[in-house]
Amino acid sequence: MPSEVTPKVPERPSRRKTSELFPLSGSESGDIKANSEPPTPAGTPNVPTRRPILKAKTMTSFESGMDQESLPKVPLQRPVRRSTTEELNNVMNNTSKELEEIESLISKHNIHNVSRKKSPTSVEEGKVAAIHQNGQRSASDNKTSTNPSPLEKNEHEGAEGNESAISPSNLVNKSNNEVTEHSDSEDLTEKQKVHAALDNEAGDRSHFEEKLIPGDMKVQVDVSKDVEEGSLNALPPSGITESDDKAEKFTKHPESSLEELQKHQEQQEEKIFQNPTDEESTTSLNEKQEGKDNMEVNSQPQGPSDTETVIAATSSNVPSQIASEEENDVPVIPRSRPKKDFEAHVQKEELPNTQEKRVSEECDSTLISTEEESKIPKIPSERPKRRAPPPVPKKPSSRIAAFQEMLQKQQQQDLHNNGNSSATTASADIAKKHTDSSITSDTTKADFTSKLNGLFALPGMVNPGQLPPSLEKKLSSPDTESKLGPQDQSQAKTGPLGGTRRGRGPRGRKLPSKVASVEKIEEDDNTNKIEIFNNWNVSSSFSKEKVLIDTTPGEQAERALDEKEKLPANAESDPLSQLPQTNTVGNRKAISEESLSPSEAITNRDQNDTTEIQEQQMEEQMEVDMERELSGGYEDVDSALHSEEASFHSL
């Protein structure tokens, strides 16, 4: 391929690099300058590459531009808060002096005639003074800084830009002030002079309080971050809201303003040391006036001077906040009582009286009209309509009518039967009461069950009104059965039982053969079967004790040895079972001689006690034999019988 067709790859674009916080080496800084963009023309303002670090917003930075600190000093110890009780006690003790001082101030300044509102011309002149002081403060800061840092340079540039932007407005304000100087000087009254004096005292006192506060306990004040950076360096002092006369002086003589301020501050400090209570009593009123002035200044924006008025408002509020925080606990006594407006009060009192009269007249007229209307009879325009007849009920269907008739008949029958049964029971009870006197105690016990009326149910006992048909037939007499015809009996037999129900299964299908072949059980109610069985049997046998009595002691010993050999374990384990046998030998000998059959013993039980004794002994013997069989003394029952027969034959 030829060289002309090959595409050219462009160079990779270099990224812009801003200046970092830390300085770079010489080679790196050279590369950055080479790759950076060409410088901007000289006519446009220089924009800083990074935002300057905000200075410490302490009281010194707002009021004294000479003493600017980088960081606020944190106090080592927390300030001790004074209790309110101590301050109140001090106020109570020193009230007489304060009252005298307040009276002297009132007599000096004639505060009764002071008006709270300022004229618009004085507000405009205060703005001009604030703008002029900002320019002077920025100039003094630039002179005092011998070795300015790059951050300070940027701040001064921003301040100069702001001054250049504000300059046309300053010229306009100056021209307006020159025109209005003559008119203002003529219109100034005693009230405005008093305002000016109070404003001067408030500003000087705020500056003096800053000096009194130690360095370790300076109060931090937060200012909104929306304020422009250039205007932060040119913050005005706290005493910016001064009188109209001083604003004019500052505009005419800008060079001598600083010297006059210093002299005035020294004079105010001496006054405060001499009578501090005067200043404390006047600060509350001055603060209120300053707040109103700042609100008026903020409510009248005038182009580029808006930012300066906002700054002036924030700076003037700072000392007032500190003073209010210090004097929150001290009660403020008003200079004068408010006067009542007697004319307005009289008008207010007259208005409700007139309204009440009008309301009462209207009520009287309405009452009279209602009474007249009630006397006049009214003829109705329309006749009242007659009520419609009640709706005729529909005839029920034949099935519903038949069902209702059947229910009525059943209810009547039930009522008739209940009445007869109650009458019969009452007559029976009366007859029983008459016969109870002649019946003995045995008959009273027999009648006890009849008085219970079925409270205690016996086995098989059912309420007579709910007996099943099978039991009714058994309990009924044969006369009633004979009265019933063969048809009724067949119906009773074929009637279904209450417990049997048809099992619900799948319809339309045949049942399985196993289920279909099952035969149903039919109960024969009229048949009775008798079964005879033996409850108990009595079997008699010869006892071994009788044989032992007839034998000699030598033969008894031999038989005992033979039994021990056959039953070594059982004979040793049950030695006590043989003791009652030896003890009752004499008794059983007498019983055996007079042995009776069980039937004769039962018949003669009540006549003779010997039969009872014999029965007890027989039971004991049977128990002993059963224990031997269960314990395994004999292997089989046959072996036990053979042993008994052998002992019998030996006799």
Curated annotation (Swiss-Prot):
Naturally occurring in which organism (per UniProt): Saccharomyces cerevisiae (strain RM11-1a)
Region annotated Interaction with SH3 domain of ABP1, chain positions: 383-396
Subunit structure, interactors included: Interacts with ribosomes. Interacts with ABP1.
Annotated InterPro entries: Aim21 (IPR021582)
Subcellular compartments: Cytoplasm, Cytoskeleton, Actin patch
Function, as annotated: Involved in mitochondrial migration along actin filaments.
Keywords, in A-Z order: Cytoplasm, Cytoskeleton, Phosphoprotein
Regions of compositional bias (Basic residues) in chain numbering: 110-119, 501-512
Residue numbers spanned by region Disordered: 1-85, 110-522, 549-651
Domain of life: Eukaryota
A Pfam family it matches: Aim21
Entry-annotated residues carrying Phosphothreonine: T18, T58, T85, T277, T552
Assigned protein family: Belongs to the AIM21 family.
Name under which the protein is recorded: Altered inheritance of mitochondria protein 21
Compositionally biased residues, Polar residues: 133-149, 164-178, 296-323, 414-427, 437-452, 575-586, 594-605
Basic and acidic residues composition bias: residue spans: 9-19, 179-213, 243-272, 339-361, 372-383, 471-482, 556-567, 639-651
